[in-house]
Design a protein with these regions (language model features):
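ER/Golgi luminal nucleotide-sugar-dependent glycosyltransferases, focusing on the catalytic module
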Residues: 1-155
Length: 155
């Protein structure tokens, strides 16, 4: 499979594995009876450069937030999947992406791209989606970084 964003060939497993992991998180979350303002889904290799606590950003309970990334496609038909934050219902919709793959791809015509699939899962909330730019001095990814192989990079 070719990923247009990175211009690389990626395996289907690279998309399906995280979607299945999120499905399992959703299975656990559905059973949880605790009431929280926000639930956060994040990759294990992501960090951010900010001395500000997330709640100091004035997050609204009915909004959906994700990590900032520069580009015209984001929040139009893609969601950056490094860090995602929302109420239980929104996070459960994301966690349900794996179970809805056939519908999303075959019936709805969404490409096998987790950025597009996540946006499609939450499209009804488009007007309440925001990207969280934790450090505007980093223009590409707003202070969000990958931590891999002993290096820290924005992409």
């Amino acid at each position: 499979m070719f990923c247009w964003k990175s211009k690389k060939q990626i395996s289907i497993t690279s998309t399906l594995s995280p979607l299945y992991s999120m499905k399992r998180v959703g299975d656990i979350l559905v059973e949880d009876t605790e009431d929280y303002d926000f639930f956060i889904l994040t990759r294990t290799d992501i960090g951010c450069n900010s001395n500000t606590k997330f709640l100091e950003f004035g997050l609204k309970k009915d909004h959906f937030y994700n990590s900032y990334v520069r580009g015209n496609e984001w929040l139009v038909d893609h969601i950056c999947a490094k860090w995602m934050c929302g109420n239980k219902d929104k996070i459960l919709k994301l966690c349900g992406t794996y179970e809805n793959l056939e519908k999303y791809i075959v019936e709805d015509g969404i490409a096998l791209c987790h950025h597009r699939l996540f946006f499609h899962a939450l499209k009804e909330y488009k007007d309440s989606m925001e990207m969280l730019n934790v450090d505007p001095s980093y223009s590409l990814a707003g202070g969000w970084f990958f931590m891999r192989n002993g290096r820290i990079t924005e992409s």
